[in-house]
Amino acid sequence: MSVLSERLVRYEELIPCRNAFIDTRSPGSDQKENFTIIGPGVAENPDQHVHIAIPHGFNIGGARQPPGCLNSQHSHLTEEVFVVSQGSWHFTTGVEGNDAVVRMEEGDIISIPMDLFRGFE
C-alpha cells in the first residue's frame, strides 16, 4: 500500500457516527452524522471510527445532517473551521443561540474561535 493510499478517504467510504456527542440524544439532533476524518477530533464517543489515525498535529472532521436537524449550542477547547459543501446552513452563537446568526451557502467558510458557544442547522 502506498503512502498516499493510506491517507486517502473517499466520500462514499466515510463511516458516520450518529452518537459522537451527547446532544445527539436530544430531539432534533438525532439525525446528525459526524465523521472523524483525520485524527480523533473532539468526539465524545471513544468508539467512533477514525479514518486516518496517523498523527498529523491537527484534526479534520465533518458533519452531515438533513434540513431542520439542529446541532445544539456547544463550545470546544479548539478552533473550528466549517466549509459548507452542500445546502444552506445557519450558524448561531451564544449560550442560548441568540447572540448572532450567520447564514452560509455552498462554498462558504467560517472560522469559529474556541470557547465560543455555537450551534448549526
Identify the function of each model-found stretch:
Residues 41-48, 59-76:
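Conserved short histidine dyad/triad with adjacent acidic residue
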Residues 55-60, 78-79, 88, 107, ...:
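Extracellular structured ligand-interaction cores
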Residues 1-57:
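A short, N-terminal "cap"/entry segment at the start of jelly-roll beta-barrel domains
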Residues 95-115:
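Short acidic-glycine-tyrosine-enriched beta hairpin
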Residues 48-53, 70-76, 93, 101-103, ...:
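Short histidine-centered beta-strand/loop micro-motifs
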Residues 62-63, 73-75, 79-84, 102, ...:
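His/acidic/aromatic-lined binding-pocket segments of jelly-roll/cupin-type domains
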Residues 66-67, 77-90, 94-95:
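Glycine- and acidic-residue-biased ligand/ion/polar-headgroup-sensing regions
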